[in-house]
Amino acid sequence: MNINDIRGLSDTEIKKKLEDAHKELFELRLKLSTRQLVNHRELPRVKNDIARILTVMRERELQIR
């Protein structure tokens, strides 16, 4: 997910995306622990998405952009 795409979303949509990303990360970690995860690059991708979402939320909180 691109940061400009996230910036175009409303606050409620961003919160929903964050919730979905946390759920996806949980499921990926569960698959990793049971050795069912095929693509290991999914974990860092989801973590980066969460970081981008939190960055945009913080920008809005501080009214930077």
Curated annotation (Swiss-Prot):
Keywords: Ribonucleoprotein, Ribosomal protein. Pfam families: Ribosomal_L29 (PF00831). Gene3D superfamilies: 1.10.287.310. The keyword Flavoprotein does not apply. One of its GO terms (molecular function) is structural constituent of ribosome. GO terms for biological process: translation. GO terms for cellular component: cytosolic large ribosomal subunit. It comes from the Bacteria. NCBIfam families: L29. Belongs to the universal ribosomal protein uL29 family. This is Large ribosomal subunit protein uL29. It comes from Dehalococcoides mccartyi (strain ATCC BAA-2266 / KCTC 15142 / 195). The lineage of its organism: Bacteria, Bacillati, Chloroflexota, Dehalococcoidia, Dehalococcoidales.
